[in-house]
Each structure stands twice: as C-alpha cells, then as structure tokens.
C-alpha cells in the first residue's frame, strides 16, 4: 500500500493531539494548534468547528500511525505476525502519547453522537489495510475460511475497541501494549482454526 502525503487535516489533528498530550486538552488553545500545524485560522475552521470537534478526530491519528508503518512491514511476514506487529505498534503509541481522559471522551462521544462515528468508519485506512491483510490470510489458507474477511475484520476491530475501552475504564492501571501482546494471539488462533 503506498504511503500517502500527510494532508492538511491530518497535520492539524496530529499537532492538536500532541499538544493535548503535552499541555492537556483544556490548556491547549486553537491558536496553539494553528501555530503548531502551520495552518491558518480559516483552514482550521474549514476542517473543524472548534477544538471540541477534534475529540472525534483521534481515529485519524490512529490511521496516520498505520500509514507510517506501511513501509516497515515485511511482505514475507505471516498475516498473523503483521496483525500482531500493527496492534503492538498502535497500542504502544496510544499508551505513551494519548491522554487517557481524551481517549475516554472519544469513546463516550462515539456512543451518543448523531454525527459520523469515526471509530466505525469503514472508509478509514485502518479498516482497508487490516481487511487486505485478513483477505491475504484467507487466500493463502493461513486463516480458515469459515468466516468472511469482513466478519474477521469486525472481530479484530471489536477486540481492539474493547481493550481500549477497558484500559480507559481502569485509567491505564496496566500496560495496554503488554496486555494486548498476551491476548491478541488467542484471538488470531481463532482466525487460524475457524470462527
């Protein structure tokens, strides 16, 4: 999958979340986000109604991380190992650079919003790339084809959302990355044996 050039919207999102982590959400101003992202006020408001709208943008930051990982994935890795690697890298980034209160806010807002639910948007890079990996696993016979790629993608995404929710619920009292490193292999065992 080719690496995409970082869009203006993605640059704003990444800058905002870096500032939220460093300074806290409440202490970060729109002006600081504009300066850090090297954009104009008009450009910022073209993409976002205000700072609050950025809470729903965390999934874009996740996609940015995945796009950074594209060139690092060895095509010779098994599909299982690709999924383990991607999950480890994403959760490590979340654990060490995302304010857990903001993650909790994102999850709660996704349950009540009437707007687009970014965490379940199938057009996201995340869903497309993980589905491609799962399809390759099904085609090669690495994953048993008793379920479709879409069904396995739903299970994988549900696993990640559940673990992130639990980690936020318990206020990060355990290592998200280490816990997932122990649990995800069991989920992928099901992919190999059949669901």
Segments (PLM) and residue ranges:
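Hydrophobic alpha-helical connector segments
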Residues: 57, 71-97, 149-156, 177
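Short hydrophobic/aromatic patch on the recognition helix
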Residues: 38-48
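C-terminal peripheral helix-coil segments that are non-catalytic and often amphipathic
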Residues: 85, 89-92, 128, 132-140, ...
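Short secondary-structure transition hinges
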Residues: 91-131, 142
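Alpha-helical DNA-contacting segments of helix-turn-helix folds
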Residues: 48, 55-62
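All-alpha amphipathic helical-bundle segments outside canonical DNA-binding/catalytic cores
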Residues: 118-123, 139-155, 178
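Basic, helix-initiating cap at the start of DNA-binding domains
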Residues: 1-23, 27-39, 53
């Amino acid at each position: 999958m080719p690496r995409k050039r970082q869009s203006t919207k993605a640059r704003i999102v990444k800058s905002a979340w870096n500032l939220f982590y460093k300074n806290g959400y409440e202490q970060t101003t729109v002006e600081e986000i504009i300066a850090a992202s090297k954009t104009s006020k008009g450009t910022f408001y073209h993409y976002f109604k205000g700072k609050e709208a950025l809470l729903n943008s965390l999934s874009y930051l996740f996609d940015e991380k995945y796009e950074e990982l594209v060139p690092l994935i060895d095509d010779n890795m098994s599909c299982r190992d690709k999924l383990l690697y991607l999950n480890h890298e994403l959760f490590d980034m979340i654990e060490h650079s995302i304010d857990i209160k903001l993650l909790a806010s994102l999850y709660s807002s996704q349950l009540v919003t009437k707007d687009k639910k970014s965490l379940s948007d199938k057009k996201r890079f995340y869903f497309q790339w993980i589905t491609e990996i799962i399809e390759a696993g099904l085609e090669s016979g690495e994953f048993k084809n008793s379920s479709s790629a879409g069904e396995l993608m739903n299970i994988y995404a549900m696993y990640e959302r559940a673990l992130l929710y639990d980690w936020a619920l318990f206020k990060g009292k355990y290592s998200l990355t280490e816990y997932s490193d122990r649990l995800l292999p069991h989920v992928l065992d099901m992919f190999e044996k059949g669901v």
